[in-house]
């Protein structure tokens, strides 16, 4: 009987359920009564988000083999055959950790949205649709379907910014949609070009595209377009300017979704499409990714250091940390690429925690200016402890996830022999500047908020209530995996080792056949540097 039950679980459409269940459930919300403060809607949304998280955990436990490098949990149903469009979903080691991260962060974001009283039905409707849409981005195995889910996710974010944001919410929401929707046209063009390549019958499935023998010029053309589209979402400097504005106007739960999940879509897409499907072009552009990653780290760290607005300071900190993802993807090292994957998971947790605390602090002080938000440590001691723990995680304190991921990226890039030694030394030295700046601006931020000169107007006019149990619980849920990964990284790295090794093997083959430049040393051994077993 247990065997039959296990067989039933293995055949269950886990990924389709994790996508369609929250989206379908969202359409029940309009039938809730409008009276009251939306308590019923909040509990309903939380139950749906938690169930979705359990479904994704079930997919990992019952149907995912960490030693299998191929796509698993595959579901393939013909949808619009005349257009070559199929409902094709699946998960490998690159997508599964991000699927789990999405459902986990969304459940906590729903809990973070508990104080929302303005149009709660629409708010939680959008959150649940966003949950299913973001899981779909990581799960779909068809490039045209990927484009559709990528676009679907933009609508809830736009409305969440435009309706529940700050006083400049319309500007921030419009800028977000112009940047992201405008750049998405390159995804559609690349999908059509790759799907129709060499045939009159289109096929957009990843497995088909990976087997195609695209010419180098064709790959470069598609690579550039996709780099722009995904670079906006990551974001890559100078395509980043929408992010500080969006974070500057968003509410705490939307902050968590932006920092925890949305930025990871760009990093995932670079791995999935640019590195995996276009290896010849990736061999040519990988040095540029390294340079862009270093620029991200230094520029955003310096800009964050100069910010006097708390939300914008943390927003630029996020941009800086995503620079490590670019370096890892461009490293041609299994260790470095594995570090990029871990950095996405790690920053998803850390970024969500910091932005939640930003929102919680603003709810009490009603200001984001560091000059006005000073000396509140005596009034909010628990909040100070939570801020300290999350800030230490962000500055990559040993024993926390950020330290391991950044160390893996640095070590993978510096020790790999694909690039010349001078290039590696120069890039690593420059990136180290950003690493040094991070603790400076984060610790000085803590000092200003909690131990600066007390603002009498703030402390007398505002009732500065310390962190409540709901807030402590949310941060505890985020800190637990942050510390767990920091102490035992294999909790996450084992899930994607096989897929990362397969990806790097494909890219190294392209490097060996590429025209040698003064950046590549050409001394890479035939053996592939295996991903870490730490």
Curated annotation (Swiss-Prot):
Record-stated family: Belongs to the complex I subunit 4 family.
Cell compartments where the protein resides: Cellular thylakoid membrane
Principal EC category: translocase
EC number: 7.1.1.-
Gene name for this UniProt entry: ndhD
One GO term (biological process): ATP synthesis coupled electron transport
Pfam families in UniProt: Proton_antipo_M
Membrane-protein topology: Multi-pass membrane protein
Transmembrane segments: 12-32, 44-64, 94-114, 120-140, 144-164, 176-196, 220-240, 251-271, 285-305, 314-334, 340-360, 384-404, 425-445, 472-492
HAMAP family assigned to the protein according to its UniProt record, in alphabetical order: NDH1_NuoM
Protein name: NAD(P)H-quinone oxidoreductase chain 4
Top-level taxon of the source organism: Bacteria
Primary subcellular site in the record, as a coarse category: membrane
InterPro entries the record matches: NADH_Q_OxRdtase_chain4 (IPR022997), NADH_Q_OxRdtase_chainM/4 (IPR010227), NADH_UbQ_OxRdtase (IPR003918), ND/Mrp_TM (IPR001750)
GO molecular function, one term: NADH dehydrogenase (ubiquinone) activity
Catalytic reaction list: a plastoquinone + NADH + (n+1) H(+)(in) = a plastoquinol + NAD(+) + n H(+)(out); a plastoquinone + NADPH + (n+1) H(+)(in) = a plastoquinol + NADP(+) + n H(+)(out)
Keywords from the named record: Membrane, NAD, NADP, Plastoquinone, Quinone, Thylakoid, Translocase, Transmembrane, Transmembrane helix
Function according to Swiss-Prot or TrEMBL: NDH-1 shuttles electrons from NAD(P)H, via FMN and iron-sulfur (Fe-S) centers, to quinones in the respiratory chain. The immediate electron acceptor for the enzyme in this species is believed to be plastoquinone. Couples the redox reaction to proton translocation (for every two electrons transferred, four hydrogen ions are translocated across the cytoplasmic membrane), and thus conserves the redox energy in a proton gradient.
An example Gene Ontology CC term for this record: plasma membrane-derived thylakoid membrane
């Amino acid at each position: 009987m247990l065997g039959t039950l296990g067989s039933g679980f293995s055949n269950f459409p886990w990924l389709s359920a994790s996508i369609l269940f929250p989206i379908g459930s969202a359409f029940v919300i309009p039938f809730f009564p409008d009276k009251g403060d939306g308590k019923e809607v909040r509990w309903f949304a939380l139950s749906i988000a938690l169930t979705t998280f359990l479904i994704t955990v079930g997919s990992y436990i019952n149907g995912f083999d960490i030693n299998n490098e191929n796509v698993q949990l595959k579901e393939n149903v013909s949808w619009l055959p005349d257009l070559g469009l199929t409902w094709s979903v699946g998960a490998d080691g690159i997508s599964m950790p991000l699927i789990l991260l999405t459902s986990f962060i969304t459940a906590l974001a729903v809990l973070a949205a508990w104080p929302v009283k303005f149009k709660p039905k629409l708010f939680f409707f959008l959150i649940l649709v966003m949950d299913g849409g973001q899981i779909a981005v990581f799960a779909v195995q068809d490039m045209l379907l990927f484009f559709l889910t990528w676009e679907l996710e933009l609508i809830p974010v736009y409305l969440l910014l435009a309706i529940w944001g700050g006083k400049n919410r319309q500007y921030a929401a419009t800028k977000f949609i112009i940047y992201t929707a405008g750049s998405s046209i390159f995804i559609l063009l690349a999908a059509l070009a790759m799907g129709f390549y060499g045939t009159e019958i289109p096929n957009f499935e990843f497995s088909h595209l990976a087997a195609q023998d695209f010419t180098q010029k064709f790959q470069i053309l598609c690579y550039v377009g996709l780099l722009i589209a995904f670079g906006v979402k990551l974001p890559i400097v100078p395509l980043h300017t929408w992010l500080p504005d969006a974070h500057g106007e968003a509410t705490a739960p939307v902050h968590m979704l932006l920092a925890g999940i949305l930025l990871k879509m760009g990093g995932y897409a670079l791995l999935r499409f640019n590195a995996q499907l276009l290896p010849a072009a990736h061999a040519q552009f990988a040095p540029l990714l390294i340079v862009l990653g270093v620029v991200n780290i230094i520029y955003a760290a310096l800009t964050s250091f100069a910010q006097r607005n708390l939300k914008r300071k943390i927003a630029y900190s996020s941009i800086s940390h995503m620079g490590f993802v670019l370096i890892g993807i461009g490293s041609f090292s299994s260790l470095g690429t594995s570090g990029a994957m871990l950095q996405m998971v790690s920053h998803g947790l850390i970024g969500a925690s910091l932005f939640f605390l930003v929102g919680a602090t603003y709810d009490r002080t009603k200001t984001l200016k560091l000059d006005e938000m000073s000396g509140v440590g005596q009034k909010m001691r628990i909040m100070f402890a939570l801020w300290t723990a999350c800030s230490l995680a962000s500055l990559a304190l040993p024993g926390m996830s950020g330290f391991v991921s950044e160390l893996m990226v640095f070590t993978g890039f510096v020790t790999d022999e694909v690039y010349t030694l001078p290039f590696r030394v120069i890039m690593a030295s420059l990136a180290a500047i950003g690493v040094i700046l991070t603790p400076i601006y984060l610790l000085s931020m803590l000092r200003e908020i909690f131990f600066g000169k007390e603002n009498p107007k703030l402390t007398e006019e505002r009732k500065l209530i310390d962190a409540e149990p709901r807030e402590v619980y949310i941060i505890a849920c985020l800190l637990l995996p942050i510390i767990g990964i920091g102490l035992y990284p294999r909790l996450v790295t084992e899930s994607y080792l096989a897929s990362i090794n397969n990806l790097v093997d494909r890219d190294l083959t392209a490097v060996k056949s590429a025209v040698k430049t003064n950046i590549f040393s050409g001394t890479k051994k035939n053996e592939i540097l295996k991903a870490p077993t730490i």
